[in-house]
Amino acid sequence: WQDGGSCYLTKFDSHEIVRGQQGDPWMGQVAWPDYPDTLSRRKNTQSWRHDWVNRQFITTETAMPQCKTFTSGLDFIERNHNEDLWFLQIEAFDPHEPFYTQNEYKKLYPDNYHGKNLDWPDYGKNEYGEAATRHVRYEYASLMSMCDHYLGKVLDMMDKYDLWKDTMLIVNTDHGFMLGEKEWMGKNVQPMYEELIHIPFFIYDPRNPIQGERRNQLAQTIDIVPTLAEFFQIAPPEYMDGHSLTPVIRNDTPIRDYALFGIFGGHICITDGRYVYMRSCKDPENQPLYEYTAMPCHMDRPFSQEEMSEAELCDKNAFNFMKQSGVFKVPVHHSTDSYRFYTMLFDLLTDPEQKCPIHDSNIEDHLCQAMKKMMKDNQAPKEQFERIGLTE
């Protein structure tokens, strides 16, 4: 419900919001809250302040936003399991940082750490040392175990009402988090390594009731909606780039040769499943770069007056998925710095931890051609090619 999420929840027939997660400005308190000495550099930020205000009211498991969210979702299933044609999204937010949970889960990972508080690590090179790094991993594991517990309640309810006979179940997440791997902590500031982008994904399809098997094909988050549309017998929009996962589920049939991924203003990346190619900007200025939007909001605030003063209205035919609706084109002067990492190529077969970039002009040329095609297929603006030094 932050500015950047405007109108998302209201597109559902019903929605429920659970407050108090992370730096949510939930409980009103003028005075700064008490908090322990910490290793985090966030301690003077408003999100840090709100988080520690909220923790004063989240002291038991049943008060945890995750518990309340899953409980609400389970209540929906309890009341609606006999109905047809329903869609439920349980968005737990966890195991997102801060990795705050209760002792019942912390005791699963005995920790002799006696240092300063560290359950909301800073993003950047890992400078915490061995003991603190191990501690934050245990904090993460504790929260992950809580997620496992509540996901188990969903599976139990699937069993209770035999929903497996006609209900699709999808378990996925948006991104990973680095906990000291390759000497990095956090996300967004480093290259898009496997720990960040190769995310867990589980799906059960009652039309193909296969259990306990893995698949080896490339898939992306954009493939979820076409899969759901097919399941509910809805024709997906013509401009949708994802593919139904049904062939993969049924017999491991591939649905794509490559996956294109990255972060705004950072590396543009492509993989064929073995090789990962990360293309950086061509120079430190990282230009030209624009944001395109019909709703000028960042995640937690509207675009500033200064930003909008530079905005121009884009050609209505620039993107066919906008159906000839105009969008703002806004210059961006600050973004993720990919130039300092340069362009990199990894072979996941011989180097799954991505510790040693390789140099192979034939593979790079091949992936460059595939990248250009996918960027065109995705209607990437022309300046994106210029930014990373590719000709269209």
Where on the chain are the PLM-derived regions?
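Histidine-centered active-site microenvironments of extracellular/periplasmic hydrolases
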Residues: P98-N112, M157-Q220
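A short beta-strand-to-alpha-helix junction
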Residues: R134-M146, N188-I199, P209-P226, A235-H243
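Polar, surface-exposed loop/tail segments
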Residues: T62, Q66, F70, K165-T167, ...
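C-terminal, low-complexity/hydrophilic appendages and adjacent surface loops
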Residues: Y193-E194, F264-H359
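Catalytic-site neighborhoods of secreted/periplasmic enzymes
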Residues: W1-T59
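Active-site His/acidic residue clusters
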Residues: G73-V136, M178, K355
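Short catalytic/ligand-binding loop motif for oxyanion handling, primarily in non-cytosolic enzymes
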Residues: W1-G4, G23-W26, D84-L85, D94-T101, ...
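A long, amphipathic alpha-helix that forms part
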Residues: M64-H81, W120-L169, F231, M374
